[in-house]
UniProtKB/Swiss-Prot annotation:
One of the GO biological process terms: coenzyme A biosynthetic process
Annotated protein name in UniProt: Phosphopantetheine adenylyltransferase
Quaternary organization: Homohexamer.
Keyword Transferase carried by entry: yes
Organism: Pseudomonas putida (strain ATCC 700007 / DSM 6899 / JCM 31910 / BCRC 17059 / LMG 24140 / F1)
Gene: coaD
Pfam families recorded: CTP_transf_like
InterPro entries: Cyt_trans-like (IPR004821), PPAT (IPR001980), Rossmann-like_a/b/a_fold (IPR014729)
Family as reported in the entry's similarity comment: Belongs to the bacterial CoaD family.
């Protein structure tokens, strides 16, 4: 059984993330969206809410599971029985960092392969950072995130 682990902060999960998960769900037996606590990134949403939003966005995919984690990714992958790390590459500029990460993960978890997918063209420019900035300034984010995520962002920035 191929179990792929798609790690990230998902602050928030975007349509670009959803696109990768949809495609991975057709390629793998089981997809785990691994939502990292990432306290050093000072996320906008708490871990529990990011997990819940990702579950809501992917609930139509029966072979997708969403789990929050705060441990070392290599350890978490072993705990979950994952044999592949999935990473998205939006642009060439993402490659250098992702390549370093893949090599480090290979040292820490040699039995887990890294697989890179590029997003569909219509989502290639979307980033969680840009979505947060647009939402904070009152812009329309409906093209970039699922409605439940848009609602959560709108509510968050009302405060």
């Amino acid at each position: 059984m191929n179990r792929v682990l798609y790690p990230g902060t998902f602050d928030p999960i975007t349509k670009g993330h959803g696109d990768l998960v949809e495609r991975a769900s057709r390629l793998f037996d089981h997809v785990i969206i691994a939502v990292a606590a990432s306290p050093k990134k000072n996320p906008l949403f708490p871990l529990e809410q990011r997990v819940e939003l990702a579950r809501e966005v992917t609930k139509h995919l029966p072979n997708v599971e969403v789990i929050g984690f705060s441990s070392l990714l290599a350890h978490f992958a072993k705990e979950q029985g994952a044999n592949v790390f999935l990473r998205g590459l939006r642009a060439v500029s993402d490659f250098e960092y992702e390549f370093q990460l893949a090599n480090m993960n290979r040292q820490l978890a040699p039995d887990v392969e890294s697989l890179f997918l590029t997003p569909s063209e219509r989502y290639s420019f979307i980033s969680s950072t840009l979505v947060r900035e647009i939402a904070a300034l009152g812009g329309d984010i409906s093209k970039f995130v699922h409605p439940v995520v848009a609602d959560a962002l709108t509510e968050r920035f009302k405060k």
